[in-house]
A protein has these predicted regions:
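Generic structural motif
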Residues: 47, 88, 113, 162, ...
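Radical SAM/AdoMet-radical enzyme domain recognition
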Residues: 1-111
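Functionally engaged cysteine thiol sites
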Residues: 17, 115, 175
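Aromatic-anchored, glycine/proline-accented short structural segments
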Residues: 98-128, 132
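Electropositive, surface-exposed helix/loop patches at the edges of structured domains
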Residues: 64, 83, 116-118, 151
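Accessory C-terminal segments flanking Radical SAM cores
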Residues: 118-175
Length: 175
């Protein structure tokens, strides 16, 4: 807690953004806001408790969802969901995750599975490209490309008639 309070007092910082798995967010959200955190990125790969547990190995979906709702109530400037879609694991949840983001006025970014760790693991068997995600999104939502630019391999789209932006972070297929 004191680390965040100390960082929040640094006047040279334009903004403080935190990326988290969300498991402790319900109890820490107000302290983080008070410390000056303005934006939060929360990992959420599934809305199904068993799939969530499988993907995170120990994660409790309800704790993360409660944390997200507490963060909304606390009033952070921006809350974004980060999601990795994987074939035959959670790829069928694409629309559910986007609809969740729309319902709660959140942004959502899809991050391609990155080739890290065990090099013997065949990521091609589970990896869902952001090109495929974009095609699927266009089947259901009206998207317009934004002029948001980052230093990384990301594209951002606004979903028409919503407050939600979708990010496609493609470190694998577009790098």
């Amino acid at each position: 807690d004191s680390l965040f309070m100390s960082i929040g007092k640094i006047k040279a910082l334009d903004e403080i953004t935190l990326t988290t798995n969300g498991s402790q967010l319900q109890s820490k959200a107000q302290m983080l806001k008070d410390a000056g955190v303005e934006r939060i990125n929360i990992s959420l790969d599934s809305l199904d408790p068993s799939t969530f547990k499988k993907m995170t190995r120990i994660g409790d979906l309800n704790k993360v969802l409660d944390g997200i709702h507490t963060a909304i109530d606390v009033g952070f400037k921006k809350i974004k969901i980060n999601t990795v879609l994987m074939k035959q694991i959670n790829e069928k949840e694409l629309y559910d995750l986007v609809d969740y983001a729309i319902k709660y006025y959140l942004d959502i970014s899809f991050i391609e599975e990155m080739p890290l760790g065990n090099t013997a693991y065949d990521r091609q068997s589970t990896s869902v490209s952001n090109d495929d995600i974009l095609l699927q999104l266009k089947e259901k939502y009206l998207l317009s490309k934004t002029d948001i630019s980052t230093s990384g391999p990301a594209e951002y789209f606004r979903i028409k008639n919503t407050k939600t932006k979708v990010g496609l972070i493609s470190p694998h297929s577009h790098n």
